[in-house]
Each structure stands twice: as structure tokens, then as C-alpha cells.
A protein has these predicted regions:
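Flexible, processing/modification-adjacent segments and terminal tails
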Residues: 23-36, 43, 96-162, 183-190, ...
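Short amphipathic beta-strand/extended segments with alternating polar/hydrophobic composition
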Residues: 65-68, 89-94, 108-115, 168, ...
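Bacterial Sec-dependent signal peptides at the C-terminal "C-region" and cleavage site
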Residues: 15-25
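Bacterial N-terminal signal peptides
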Residues: 7-17
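N-terminal mature ectodomain segment of secretory-pathway/periplasmic proteins
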Residues: 23, 28-105, 139-140
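Gly/Pro-enriched, hydrophobic low-complexity segments
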Residues: 150-241
Length: 243
């Protein structure tokens, strides 16, 4: 279960930052508009790293844990959380995804699909400025009405073929909902819906601070960012797999 929680946390961080709606405007016009809506090019590029503290709740299991997440641009990440008295640590150094076994104290490399998900969750914030550079393509699929309001529907496709459906508020250009697929703790592919809200400025950069995910129609996970501290001068060794 813990790896599933880690993957969910990585996913909502990526999608909760910036997404791109398309319409009759040109791509360049859309990129310029969305970039400005999220603080502008300078604000995005000014974020060198982040330290995020918050909580994760899994209502169906009556589980609530605190976490600390470190993100260094362009592609490094480390997540620490305490579950049932044990500290779980997972990281990505730009090349290798790994996790620390709390019982042995040794780090092991994470293989397969989980490693791909972790790498994707460590994507640079600046991908918005040049999606193609990061292997991302976007297709506008029209509009869809949700609770009486129309949202722009965007299909986001990564270079490995993985897809997500994004629902964009046409008034704010912020992500309202994400529909995606992932493997659950039983390694069964499931569809999840994540609602993002409580957007706040972090040194001029706009990102969601509250994410609620639903699995099979029921609330599965609630992630709250309590504090986001940018530009803390994180060192690379923090993200390396311990030998």
C-alpha cells in the first residue's frame, strides 16, 4: 500500500502545478496565457527547489500520516513519511528510483512501472515552457459539463504512451480534475479521479495545495500541503540512493 501512496503523491504534485488547456488559439498564445496565469516564466524558472510538508489521509483505512517532500529542479525528488511507527523514504536522483527498507536500513532500486511513475512525478516545473522537450503531447478533446459547468477536456500523453485526462476551468485555467489509470496495491489497473483546489502562490508560482482522489467512486486519499518552502538550497546528495 505504501508504494501506491507514494505514486499518488507524486502524481498529484505534477498535475497540481500546471496544465495546458487548448482552444481555437495557437499553441504559442495558449502557452503564453497559461504561463502568465501561473505567475509567469520568471516565477516558474525562479523555483530551484521546494520543501513541502503536509498530511495524507486514507479514510477507508482510518490512516493519517505526515510527509515531507523535497523537489530539486529539474528532476530530483525525495519523499519521507512515517507509517505505523516506521519512516518510509523514497527518492529519485535524476536517473535511479529507489526506496529505503525500514527494517534493514538498506536502499533498493525500484524497478518497472513504479520507477517510470516516479521519474514522471519528478518532472521539471519548467516543462510548461516547452512540453515537447519533455516528451509531452496535448490533444484538446472538447468540453464536458460537470455539475452544471463546462470544462475544457485535454488528453495529455507522455512519450511512453501513458495518458491522463485533464479537466480545465476555462475561467481560471487551473486544473479542476484529473482522470488517470494506475496500479493499485494489488497490482490491478484502476481508474482514479483527483480533484485539485486551494491554489496558492509560492514565491509567485501558483500550485494546488489540496488534492482529493477517488477510487471506484469512493474517496481514497486526501493530500494537504501545509507548508511549501521554496529555494532552500537542497544538495544533490539528499536524493542519491544510499549504498
Amino acid at each position: 500500500m505504501k508504494r501506491f501512496i507514494f505514486i499518488c503523491l507524486l502524481g498529484v504534485f505534477l498535475f497540481g502545478s500546471i496544465q495546458i488547456p487548448l482552444n481555437s488559439q495557437t499553441m504559442d498564445e495558449i502557452l503564453k496565457e497559461i504561463t502568465q496565469a501561473h505567475g509567469g516564466k520568471a516565477a516558474i524558472e525562479n523555483i530551484k527547489d521546494m520543501k513541502i510538508t503536509g498530511t495524507i489521509e486514507v479514510p477507508q483505512q482510518e490512516l493519517k500520516v505526515s510527509f515531507t517532500q523535497y523537489k530539486k529542479e529539474p528532476d530530483k525528488r525525495r519523499i519521507e513519511m512515517k507509517v505505523m511507527g516506521m519512516v518510509q523514504i523514497q527518492g529519485f536522483d535524476g536517473k535511479t528510483a529507489w526506496e529505503l527498507n525500514p527494517q534493514t536500513g538498506k536502499a533498493i532500486e525500484i524497478p518497472g512501472e513504479d520507477a517510470i511513475d516516479i521519474k514522471r512525478g519528478s518532472l521539471a516545473l519548467a516543462w510548461i515552457l516547452d512540453p515537447k522537450k519533455y516528451g509531452i503531447s496535448l490533444v484538446y478533446k472538447g468540453r464536458e459539463k460537470i455539475d452544471g459547468k463546462y470544462y475544457l477536456v485535454l488528453e495529455q500523453v507522455y512519450s511512453d504512451g501513458d495518458k491522463s485526462i485533464l479537466y480545465i476551468d476555462p475561467e481560471t485555467y487551473l486544473t479542476f480534475k484529473i482522470k488517470s489509470k494506475m496500479l493499485d496495491e494489488m497490482m490491478v489497473e484502476v481508474e482514479t479521479e483527483t480533484y485539485l483546489s486551494d491554489y496558492k502562490s509560492v514565491k509567485g508560482y501558483i500550485m494546488a495545495h489540496k488534492m482529493i482522489s477517488y477510487l471506484r467512486g469512493k474517496e481514497y486519499m486526501r493530500i494537504i500541503y501545509k507548508k511549501v518552502k521554496p529555494n532552500t538550497r537542497l544538495r544533490d546528495h539528499l536524493f542519491l540512493m544510499q549504498k
